[in-house]
């Protein structure tokens, strides 16, 4: 396979015939957040809400959100594909269909979804399709997965507002997928809160420099 063919393959979602089979049992992961000590899989306090963000390599994306006041816990994992309970190595092949994502569990009385969305839009480049900077492939695509119709509408409205802001600077179009939350598979313990354990580790987050104009209250 030529370099061009290999690159093109990385940028395409796998067919059902190509996807890896995965497994029935979940991949072992950490029980508690390395920074906060809160349970990664719950139970969480009443009133907490959830959203999944994919914005390239999940190491830097997770650190971005666990630092936000009002975010109760974060976890990295895989979502949006077909393979059940994939490993990191399997996901990196591009043959699971999954994106690297961050689960953000937050208190809406302290931080709004719009505030989280503003960080999402500003801290990565949502116009790059199946890549994020030097991280190339469907695994690194930009996604927002919401857990109810109201939150999905809020996310779509924020996308429209940010699209206009980008267009005014000659940038775009936005390629971010917004959809109802699919199954979320927790990544291995090694990847959870990676940049807290490895402060000098890789972080590929790079924004466009365009501010998000959406109202922060919702």
Swiss-Prot record:
Keywords in alphabetical order: Oxidoreductase
EC identifiers of the protein: 1.8.4.11
GO biological process: cellular response to oxidative stress; protein modification process
Pfam families: PMSR
Gene Ontology MF terms in the entry: L-methionine-(S)-S-oxide reductase activity; peptide-methionine (S)-S-oxide reductase activity
Enzyme class name: oxidoreductase
Reaction catalyzed: L-methionyl-[protein] + [thioredoxin]-disulfide + H2O = L-methionyl-(S)-S-oxide-[protein] + [thioredoxin]-dithiol; [thioredoxin]-disulfide + L-methionine + H2O = L-methionine (S)-S-oxide + [thioredoxin]-dithiol
Family: Belongs to the MsrA Met sulfoxide reductase family.
PANTHER family: MITOCHONDRIAL PEPTIDE METHIONINE SULFOXIDE REDUCTASE (PTHR42799:SF2)
Role of this protein: Has an important function as a repair enzyme for proteins that have been inactivated by oxidation. Catalyzes the reversible oxidation-reduction of methionine sulfoxide in proteins to methionine.
Protein name: Peptide methionine sulfoxide reductase MsrA
């Amino acid at each position: 396979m030529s370099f061009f063919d290999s690159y093109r393959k990385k940028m395409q979602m796998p067919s059902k015939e190509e996807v890896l089979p995965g497994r029935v049992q979940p991949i072992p992961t950490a029980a508690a957040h390395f920074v906060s000590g809160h349970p990664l899989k719950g139970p969480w306090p009443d009133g907490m809400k959830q959203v999944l963000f994919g914005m390239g390599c999940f190491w830097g994306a997770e650190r971005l959100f666990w630092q936000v006041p009002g975010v109760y816990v974060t976890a990295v994992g895989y979502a949006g594909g077909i393979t059940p309970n994939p490993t990191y190595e399997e996901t990196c092949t591009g043959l699971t269909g999954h994106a690297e994502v961050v689960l953000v569990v937050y208190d809406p009385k302290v931080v709004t979804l719009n505030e989280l969305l503003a960080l999402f839009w500003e801290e990565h480049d949502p116009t790059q399709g199946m890549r994020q900077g030097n991280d190339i492939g469907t695994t690194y695509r930009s996604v927002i997965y919401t857990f109810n119709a109201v939150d999905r509408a809020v996310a779509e409205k924020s996308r429209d507002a940010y699209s206009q802001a980008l267009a005014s600077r000659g940038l775009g179009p936005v390629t971010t997928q917004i959809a109802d939350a699919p199954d979320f598979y927790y990544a291995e313990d090694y990847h959870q809160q990676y940049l807290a354990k490895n402060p000098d580790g890789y972080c590929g987050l790079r924004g466009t420099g365009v501010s998000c104009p959406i109202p922060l209250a919702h």
